[in-house]
């Protein structure tokens, strides 16, 4: 099992699909990486040589922000908004939708499970 960017990549899958197991690399970036390195898209991970795995690893480290670094940057951006006290930061702080969605009836994913109101019956 190849290990790239701290993630164990499944060996039976095609390289393009297997790279999407890394946080921060989707199908588009995976295709770009494979084209840059020059590996055929239909090749499977267990068919890769050590040199090819090393090339993929270097391409990801050089050109993309993945896994822990990406998560840390995202968390720092949210923390910055919260520290500024801007509208988006307040919405993050209160656990409400940030991008203008309605909250009167929906937004259960962001707000959590519904809270029962005492004395309210049908």
Curated annotation (Swiss-Prot):
Located at the top of the head of the 30S subunit, it contacts several helices of the 16S rRNA. In the 70S ribosome it contacts the 23S rRNA (bridge B1a) and protein L5 of the 50S subunit (bridge B1b), connecting the 2 subunits; these bridges are implicated in subunit movement. Contacts the tRNAs in the A and P-sites. This is Small ribosomal subunit protein uS13. The gene is rpsM. Part of the 30S ribosomal subunit. Forms a loose heterodimer with protein S19. Forms two bridges to the 50S subunit in the 70S ribosome. PROSITE patterns: RIBOSOMAL_S13_1, RIBOSOMAL_S13_2. Keywords: Ribonucleoprotein, Ribosomal protein, RNA-binding, rRNA-binding, tRNA-binding. Belongs to the universal ribosomal protein uS13 family. It holds the Pfam family Ribosomal_S13. The keyword RNA-binding applies. One of its GO terms (biological process) is translation.
């Amino acid at each position: 099992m190849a290990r790239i960017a701290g993630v164990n990549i499944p060996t039976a899958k095609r390289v393009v699909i297997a790279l999407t197991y890394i946080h921060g690399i989707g199908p588009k970036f995976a295709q770009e990486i494979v084209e840059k390195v020059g590996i055929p898209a239909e090749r499977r991970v267990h068919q890769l040589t050590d040199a090819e795995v090393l090339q993929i690893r270097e391409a990801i480290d050089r050109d993309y922000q993945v896994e822990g670094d990406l998560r840390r940057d995202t968390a720092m951006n949210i923390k910055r908004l919260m520290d500024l006290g801007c509208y988006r930061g307040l919405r993050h702080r209160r656990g409400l939708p940030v991008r203008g969605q309605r909250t009167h009836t929906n937004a259960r994913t962001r707000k959590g499970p519904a809270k029962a109101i005492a004395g309210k019956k049908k």
